[in-house]
């Protein structure tokens, strides 16, 4: 697979925002999502992640073909606020729908691992939804293991 990586530009913002918003919306547990107004949620979420999407706290990378066809993107930065050792962190990884299942996600995660290694990090982490079995399978095949689990309990 011939993949070119380049820094994201402002011209990429629209597709990155749309993809991120849809991915996160889909990951919200169903019992929470039914109570949310999509437009209000998007406005709230945009405020929360703007520094990450703008690249203020992260590096945004686009994967594309030699003909500049979008394959996916990855947003990388530093994590590790639980321990004193800084770690690489994959804030978002997204693959174009027509490229899923073709190795692009695996390529992006391996590329992100190299990115972290080159910066001296000894570990890279990410967060994935319990319901995203396909992504979890890719991450586990690349050596990622579950370390923490977020749990929720409805109070109604």
Predicted regions and their residues:
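Conserved N-terminal entry element of GNAT/NAT acetyltransferase domains
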Residues: 1-14, 22, 31
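A short helix-loop-beta-strand connector motif used in the catalytic cores of GNAT acetyltransferases and
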Residues: 33, 46-62, 89
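A conserved beta-turn-beta hairpin within the catalytic core of GNAT-like acetyltransferases
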Residues: 69, 79-90, 100, 147-148
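Conserved beta-strand-loop-alpha-helix junction that forms the acyl-donor binding cleft
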Residues: 97-100, 122-135, 152-156
